[in-house]
């Protein structure tokens, strides 16, 4: 989660929210950043000072509960309940209900998580949970899921204190 400052978006965030999605109002064309031209910025949590992400931001919201429940139900093979939760969430955003099943349902849940939780620190864990590569846009470097940096090192005192704990590879 960003603690302070305005976060620049890549066009991927912009493209998936700019149409009929009310979340498009949370993005603006910002200032020039590091000579890269004007950037798209997320203004989701504006502070009284006028800066994004300068004040306390929500830790959990109703939308997260809907999407967590949708994903959990999908994983429990209860696609009907997953679809109900997903459509309840979409209704809160003024989006039309969908009728999906199988992998298409999971992909829609993950897409809504991508849009809803932009700049809140969720995407990394969503990608990690499903073993998907992490695409970094600044600098333009990709981190494959097999890269040892996907997992942080376990504190050495924990490894030393428990013979059943093995240090994550690469550390």
Question: Where is each model-derived feature located?
Answer:
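Acidic/polar-rich alpha-helix caps and helix-coil junctions
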Residues: 1-171
């Amino acid at each position: 989660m960003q603690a302070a400052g305005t976060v620049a978006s890549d066009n991927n965030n912009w493209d998936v929210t700019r149409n009929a999605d009310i979340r498009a109002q949370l993005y603006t064309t910002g200032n020039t950043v590091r000579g890269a031209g004007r950037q798209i910025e997320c203004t989701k949590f504006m502070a009284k000072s006028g800066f994004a992400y300068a004040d306390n931001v929500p830790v959990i919201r109703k939308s997260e509960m809907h999407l967590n429940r949708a994903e959990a139900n999908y994983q429990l093979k209860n696609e009907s309940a997953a679809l109900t939760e997903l459509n309840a969430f979409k209704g809160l955003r003024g989006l039309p209900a969908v009728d999906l099943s199988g992998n298409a349902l999971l992909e829609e849940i993950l897409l809504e998580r991508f849009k809803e939780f932009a700049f809140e620190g969720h995407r990394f864990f969503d990608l990690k949970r499903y073993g998907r590569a992490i695409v970094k846009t600044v600098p333009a470097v990709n981190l494959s899921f097999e890269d040892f940096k996907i997992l942080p090192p376990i504190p050495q005192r924990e490894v030393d204190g428990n013979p059943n704990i093995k240090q994550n590879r690469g550390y």
